[in-house]
C-alpha cells in the first residue's frame, strides 16, 4: 500500500478541517485515548522500589505494543489500492497537527502584535510549560517560536515520517511514544526512573525527523546558508538531542536568539542560547516564524507527495 499517499490524504483533511470541536466533544481524540491508558497504567505501576525502571519499561512496551497491534489490524483490514489509501488517510488524519499547531501559535501572535501582553501570556500558556507571568514581549515571542519549532518536529514531521515508513502502525505507534514521553518522560523524582524508557525511545524515534524538520526550516528560509550554519553550529548545545535542530534552524532563519534561560513554575532552567549573538525576537518575528512554518510544511508536503508519486509508478 502507498503509505506516502495515505499521509497526503491525512494532511489534506487536517488542513481543511483540523480536529473539529464537535467531533472532539463526541468521541474525544485518539491521543487522549492513549493518554488515558498511560494514566491508568502509571497509577497502578509507578511506585517506589528497585524495579521501578523495569515497570516503566513494561508500561512503555504495553502502550506502544497495544497501539501498534490495533493499528496494524486495522491496516490489514483495509481494501487494496486507492480505496485503502483513502480510508487509511482518514484514519491517519487525527495524528496530524498541521492546522492546530499554526492556530495555537497564531493565537499568541495576534494579541502580542496588538500590544496585548496579558492576552499573549494567556495564549502562550496553552503551548508551553514555563511561567507566563514572568514573560515580557520578547519572552512570549521566544516561547512561542520555540514551541512552533519543536512541535513541528514532534507533532507533524515525525508522525508523518513514520507514517510514510509503516502506515497506520507507524503514525499511531509514534504518537503513542510521544505521548508517553510527554506524560511520564520527565526528570523528576516521580518519573526519572519510571519514565526512563519512554524518554529514551522518544529520543530514538525523533533522531531523523528532528533533523529533517531543521532542514525544512532552513531550506524554506530566504537566508538558507545562515539557517544551516546556525543549525550545524548550535543544535547539539540544546539539552535535548533532537529539539535543538529545528529550534536552531528557526533561530538562524529569523536572525533571532532562542532557548536560553527560562523560568518554569517549579524551577529555573539555565539553557545555552541558540544563535546567541542575535537579538531577542520581537512580536513581528512571530508572524515571520509562522510564515516560515507555512513554507516549510508546504515543502514537506511536496516531498511526501513526490514520494507518493514515485511509489505509485514503481
From Swiss-Prot:
Keywords: Cell membrane, Cobalamin biosynthesis, Membrane, Transmembrane, Transmembrane helix. The keyword Ion transport does not apply. One of its GO terms (molecular function) is threonine-phosphate decarboxylase activity. It holds the Pfam family CobD_Cbib. It is a multi-pass membrane protein. The chain crosses the membrane at residues 3-23, 57-77, 78-98, 154-174, 290-310. It is found in: Cell membrane. Its main location: membrane. Pathway: Cofactor biosynthesis; adenosylcobalamin biosynthesis. One of its GO terms (cellular component) is plasma membrane. GO terms for biological process: cobalamin biosynthetic process. Disulfide bonds: none annotated. InterPro entries: Cobalamin_biosynth_CobD/CbiB. It comes from the Bacteria. Converts cobyric acid to cobinamide by the addition of aminopropanol on the F carboxylic group. Belongs to the CobD/CbiB family. This is Cobalamin biosynthesis protein CobD. The gene is cobD.
